Curated annotation (Swiss-Prot):
This is Cytochrome c oxidase subunit 7. Component of the cytochrome c oxidase (complex IV, CIV), a multisubunit enzyme composed of a catalytic core of 3 subunits and several supernumerary subunits. The complex exists as a monomer or a dimer and forms supercomplexes (SCs) in the inner mitochondrial membrane with ubiquinol-cytochrome c oxidoreductase (cytochrome b-c1 complex, complex III, CIII). It is found in: Mitochondrion inner membrane. It comes from Schizosaccharomyces pombe (strain 972 / ATCC 24843) (Fission yeast). Component of the cytochrome c oxidase, the last enzyme in the mitochondrial electron transport chain which drives oxidative phosphorylation. The respiratory chain contains 3 multisubunit complexes succinate dehydrogenase (complex II, CII), ubiquinol-cytochrome c oxidoreductase (cytochrome b-c1 complex, complex III, CIII) and cytochrome c oxidase (complex IV, CIV), that cooperate to transfer electrons derived from NADH and succinate to molecular oxygen, creating an electrochemical gradient over the inner membrane that drives transmembrane transport and the ATP synthase. Its main location: mitochondrion. Residues 48-59 are mitochondrial intermembrane. Residues 1-24 are mitochondrial matrix. The chain crosses the membrane at residues 25-47. Keywords: Membrane, Mitochondrion, Mitochondrion inner membrane, Oxidoreductase, Transmembrane, Transmembrane helix. Pfam families: COX7a. GO terms for cellular component: mitochondrial inner membrane; respiratory chain complex IV. It is a single-pass membrane protein. Pathway: Energy metabolism; oxidative phosphorylation.
Length: 59
């Protein structure tokens, strides 16, 4: 079995991106997560505004 640690280290250090975006295909996991978190944050602000103005239901 060949040791490929040095080649992997060279690959990862040559890319100037954050660690969580360096691997191929990682954007398929990271960006949907960002979208869900942004949507939940916006919904939370919307529902908080509704409660502040006296409307108990979010819809």
């Amino acid at each position: 079995m060949k040791n490929t640690i040095v080649q992997q280290q060279r690959f990862l250090q040559s890319i100037h991106k954050p660690t969580y975006l360096q691997r191929p295909g990682s954007f398929a996991l990271v960006y949907p997560y960002y979208a869900v978190m942004a949507g939940l944050g916006l919904y939370s602000l919307y529902a908080s505004g509704r409660v502040i103005f006296g409307k108990k239901d979010a819809f």
